[in-house]
Amino acid sequence: MTPDREITFVLTSCGRFDLLEETVHTFAACNTAPIARWVIVEDSGRPGVRDAVAGTGLPFEFIENDPPIGQMASIDRAYATVTTPYLFHCEDDWRFFRSGFVEESLVLLERLPEVSAVMCRRAGQNARHDAIVATAPPRTLEGVVYRLPPPHVDDVWFGYGFNPGLRRLADARAFGSFAARGHEKHASLWFKRRGMGMASLEVPACETTGQERHVGDATATPGWETVGRARPPGTVAAPRSRNDPCPCGSGERYKHCHGLPG
């Protein structure tokens, strides 16, 4: 792969080492694209992450947060080390089951500037995700079948997200600090305002394994934010209209910021 197409694999983990082990082993077994660097950021403050991935034989680099700093700040730490033009963002609770998906995603990102990231998860595990994807007809580009929902289909989601998928480093750099923005939903809104959104491969490549193991529950590591399920930190007084700017200074409308349901 030429330098202008190089990819860094970045995975966020938080103490669910059994799920992490399956994630990296199945990705390694299915992936056929050259990966320049393999980076894991571990935010549990617990030992075990190195042992969980040792069997892959891959040259993982580790960023271990102790004490934990949260997902968004962890993403900032990991992304700050990336120098390749593309990165495959992954979480610790996925199972991959087919090859070629990284190369297919690269085709879309190279040809479609309006695509912020390329998702590859299967249907049937997230009803809202499935409903958004279903609004777009299948399209084909250089043999890759995909869907690209228009930004207006959902008020908040599908502008950007942290499910497994390839994305451009340049877009992440343009966005800036994820921790400073607040939550995954605010990243999504930022990209939507710029007319960008996530594409979804018609032939899926992965499925989540952590639906019953959200990081905030008793079987996982305490103190982790459940991204997309909470308001931004702090409280503010509601403005007269939910369409007014949020008083917190985020630049979002109140209904898309502190006015989001908890």
Where are these regions (language model features)?
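Short, well-formed alpha-helical segments that are part of the catalytic scaffolds
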Residues: 16-30
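C-terminal catalytic/acceptor-binding lobe
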Residues: 22, 157-239
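A conserved acidic beta->alpha catalytic loop
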Residues: 40-50
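Short beta-strand-to-loop acidic/aromatic patch adjacent to the donor-nucleotide binding site
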Residues: 85-95
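Conserved donor-nucleotide/metal-binding helix-loop-beta segment in metal-dependent transferases, i.e.
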Residues: 99-118
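Short beta-strand-to-loop element that shapes/binds the nucleotide-sugar donor at the catalytic cleft/hinge
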Residues: 118-133
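Acidic/negatively charged segments and metal-coordination signatures
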Residues: 231-262
